[in-house]
């Protein structure tokens, strides 16, 4: 019951923290110029979070689970398993098994990231295919962008929830706390970034709050469902396939898609950027906005460095 109460507490904290962070742009009245700056900062936070927090944490979770698995087994059992695999694979060198494990993990990293990215790409295409039937293609594109951004972050948050539920099922408090801190480090900035992006896109405040609530609920609900729904045998199987790390890396792929394909182009287009050679509108972002974008990218990096120490 101890594990259940801890996952409940973590889920509740995640819900409240995420929702409060998301209401900051709504609570403060920004001018047009300041709203643009906040949106750019939010875009930077999304990108920095994906690159500096989620991917490293996912990779760390993968390798940590492998190393713990090696240390936790009895030495005789490990030697027997290794020798059996060596006979099966024809590996002579003692380092062969170690290298094989690392190759397998490298494959996990790439596959998880790419699947997350491709999943969001397909969701985006399906969503935009439904939208293109509208008479006004520009309005349809904008609506599709809002929905995809929210949906992408909700899918990402759901994957986070699965990661936390899988971490809780390992019964290791340190793993639970690391995953929780990693998720909160990027969920709060992501909520801020999502709300500022939706405000810039011109959504009504009531609808923005609904989007935010869905985003805030996704991770806690999925964490509880994952934890409660897993039988002991499933938990053991999940720990064998490094579920926590894989789920985090999959969510990083969805996050990268949302940040790079939707939010950044929207932000870049705000300054009337033009790629035409003689285009006088090719201003792009102002120096202040570029500074805000870079700052947004660096904040998660600084937070993650502080968290590691």
Swiss-Prot record:
GO biological processes: bicellular tight junction assembly; egg activation; intracellular zinc ion homeostasis; regulation of cellular response to testosterone stimulus; regulation of vascular endothelial cell proliferation; zinc ion transmembrane transport; zinc ion transport
Ranges annotated as spanning the membrane: 7-27, 35-55, 107-127, 147-167, 177-197, 211-231, 245-265, 285-305
InterPro entries: ZIP (IPR003689), ZIP9 (IPR045891)
Disulfide bonds: none
Gene Ontology MF term list: androgen binding; G protein-coupled receptor activity; zinc efflux transmembrane transporter activity; zinc ion transmembrane transporter activity
Protein's UniProt keywords contain Transport: yes
Catalytic reaction equation(s): Zn(2+)(in) = Zn(2+)(out)
Pfam families: Zip (PF02535)
Membrane topology: Multi-pass membrane protein
Localization of this protein: Cell membrane; Cytoplasm, Perinuclear region; Golgi apparatus, trans-Golgi network membrane; Mitochondrion
Entry GO CC: mitochondrial membrane; mitochondrion; nucleus; perinuclear region of cytoplasm; plasma membrane; trans-Golgi network
Superkingdom of this protein's organism: Eukaryota
Glycosylation sites: 29, 242
Phenotype upon gene inactivation: Homozygous Knockout females fish for SLC39A9 show significant reductions in fecundity, embryo viability, and growth of their offspring. Furthermore, a high proportion of eggs fail to undergo normal chorion elevation during activation.
Alphabetic keyword roster: Cell membrane, Cytoplasm, Glycoprotein, Golgi apparatus, Ion transport, Membrane, Mitochondrion, Nucleus, Transmembrane, Transmembrane helix, Transport, Zinc, Zinc transport
Keyword Plastid in annotation: no
Family of this protein: Belongs to the ZIP transporter (TC 2.A.5) family.
Function: Has dual functions as a membrane-bound androgen receptor and as an androgen-dependent zinc transporter both of which are mediated through G protein activation and are required for the androgen-dependent apoptotic response. Upon androgen binding, mediates apoptosis by directly activating a stimulatory G protein that leads to increased cAMP levels and MAP kinase activity and which is accompanied by increased intracellular free zinc levels. May play a role in the proper zinc modulation during egg activation.
Record protein name field: Zinc transporter ZIP9
Organism in which the protein naturally occurs: Danio rerio
Upper taxonomic lineage: Eukaryota, Metazoa, Chordata, Craniata, Vertebrata
Gene this protein is translated from: slc39a9
